[in-house]
């Protein structure tokens, strides 16, 4: 049932979910090699990606070691079976990978949408405040909705510091690009998307599952919320 519900998960992510279940129930965690063998026997391993052309890589490091110091944002388009399209913009924390906020529309993403996205992210992390207690970098590409003068001015007013990727290298915002691939692969492609309303209804559930369940290799195969909870607990305990 686990594999049937998550057909795009490889053996390491399946192992992470089984480990999480074992921890919750107080049982020993399964061995990752055993999970691999069982999935191989039953033909459940994912095929290796053959790869295409060489990808451009970000020369700097997008990820940070401290939460609430750098956020990144990007957008994606989801095509529906009836030809409608839903455009989504999102904000991630570059440490814990949580999808803090999103906006979605059947029109184009505007500067006003991005400003709403900023406010939602700030309120999610800090509550209703007029300005962040300390500045946070806001990493995006050079899309017009992000570089609009009013948007950049608004960002500065609330304590966000706009940072943009090189003009000819949108993939340098690698964390946001990875999130787009994850959302399309693990949620959109395995869900019914007959029309825009169906996508808009499912988006909150997809993002909740991503935040609560989806294991990240860079987080020790923990979900963003698991990572946040463990970080908070360790901070309170002084470890």
What annotation goes with each model-predicted range?
Residues 1-70, 223-232:
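Basic, flexible linker segments flanking DNA-binding modules
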Residues 6-8, 24-26, 65, 80-81, ...:
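Conserved, non-catalytic sequence blocks in retroelement Pol enzymes and Pol-derived host proteins
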Residues 49-53, 104, 138-142, 157-175, ...:
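RNase H-like polynucleotidyl transferase catalytic core
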Residues 129-147, 222-225:
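Acidic/histidine-rich, metal-coordinating catalytic segments
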Residues 134, 156-160, 182-239:
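C-terminal domain-tail junction helix/linker
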């Amino acid at each position: 049932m686990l594999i049937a519900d998550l057909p795009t998960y490889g053996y390491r992510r399946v192992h992470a979910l089984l480990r999480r279940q074992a921890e919750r129930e107080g049982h020993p965690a399964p061995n990752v090699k055993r999970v691999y063998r069982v999935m191989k026997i039953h033909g459940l391993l994912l095929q290796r990606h053959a790869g295409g052309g060489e990808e451009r890589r970000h020369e700097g490091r997008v990820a940070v070691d401290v939460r609430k110091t750098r956020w990144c944002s990007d957008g994606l388009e989801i095509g529906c079976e009836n030809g409608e399209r839903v455009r989504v913009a999102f904000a991630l924390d570059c440490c814990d990978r949580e999808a803090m906020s999103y906006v979605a529309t059947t029109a184009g993403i505007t500067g006003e949408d991005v400003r709403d996205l900023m406010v939602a992210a700030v309120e999610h992390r800090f509550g209703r405040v007029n300005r962040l207690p300390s500045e946070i970098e806001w990493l995006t590409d050079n899309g017009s909705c992000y570089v609009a003068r009013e948007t950049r001015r608004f960002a500065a007013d609330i304590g966000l510091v706009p940072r943009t990727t090189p003009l000819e290298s949108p993939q340098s915002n690698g964390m946001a690009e990875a999130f787009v691939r994850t959302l399309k692969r693990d949620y959109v492609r395995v869900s019914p998307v007959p029309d825009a309303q169906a996508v808009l209804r499912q988006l909150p559930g997809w993002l909740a599952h991503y935040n609560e369940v989806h294991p990240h290799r860079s987080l020790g195969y923990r979900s963003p919320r698991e990572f946040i909870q463990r970080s908070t607990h360790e901070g309170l305990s002084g470890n």
